[in-house]
């Protein structure tokens, strides 16, 4: 059995780890341009699409094209669909938060981590609106480090340095685990910052044996022990 990690803080990616694209918003936006999808395939499409990218989001056209392909959108409709998703992801235009569907156990797991006395910081490559968007999803009061706000993005270690500062005095990289769903941004970035990464991989798509994996956030407790 893998030894548990003695830690004082847990960093979490946002998109793909605690929130996903809302399946009904995605299906509705595509339906408005005459493209039908299976809404229940949205989460699976995300995890398949994000494997090769450092950042997922409506503002990342390469990710969105792969996401749409995984949803079965025909190639000849792709560019139109990319525009539809980009518009949906712009809260100022759409009036909704695209990344607002909670992953299973997200709220309960974060609550249990905090009850155990561990600090929690959300570390996300985003557009400057992550904190307000996540607050609307039920995460008000959880510290958020947004790449656009701090001026560095995963895998740059500086974004993790900002998160360490936010976590509080005395928190060192060795005291922290970071949970993320991308190899390039989350796993490599955490390692570069001296932080132990845990790969959030619900579909078991990653076969690498050089880092830890969880399929659900509730599984984190198999890897962690709270340090006083």
Task: Describe each PLM feature range.
Residues 1-17, 73, 107, 111-114, ...:
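Asp-based, Mg2+/Mn2+-dependent phosphohydrolase catalytic module
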Residues 2-118, 128-132:
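N-terminal helical cap/lid subdomain that shapes the substrate entry/recognition surface
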């Amino acid at each position: 059995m893998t030894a548990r990690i003695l830690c004082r803080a847990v960093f979490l990616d946002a998109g793909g780890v605690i929130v996903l694209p809302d399946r009904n918003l995605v299906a509705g936006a595509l339906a408005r341009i005459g493209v039908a999808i299976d809404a229940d395939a949205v989460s699976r499409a995300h995890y398949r699409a994000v494997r090769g990218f450092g950042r997922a989001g409506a503002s990342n056209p390469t990710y969105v094209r792969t996401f749409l392909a995984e949803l079965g959108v025909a190639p000849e409709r792709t560019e139109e669909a990319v525009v539809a998703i980009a518009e949906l992801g712009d809260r100022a235009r759409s009036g909704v938060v695209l990344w607002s569907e909670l992953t299973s156990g997200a709220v309960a797991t974060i609550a249990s981590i905090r009850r155990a006395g561990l600090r929690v910081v959300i570390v996300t490559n985003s557009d400057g609106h992550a904190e307000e968007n996540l607050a609307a999803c039920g995460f008000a009061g959880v510290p958020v480090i947004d790449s656009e706000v701090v001026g560095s993005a995963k895998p740059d270690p500086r974004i993790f340095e900002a998160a360490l500062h936010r976590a509080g005095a005395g928190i060192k990289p060795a005291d922290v685990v970071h949970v993320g769903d991308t190899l390039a941004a989350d796993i490599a970035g955490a390692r570069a910052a001296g932080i132990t990464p845990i790969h959030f991989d619900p579909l078991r798509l990653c076969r690498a044996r050089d880092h830890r994996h969880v399929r659900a956030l509730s599984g984190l407790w198999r890897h962690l022990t709270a340090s006083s």
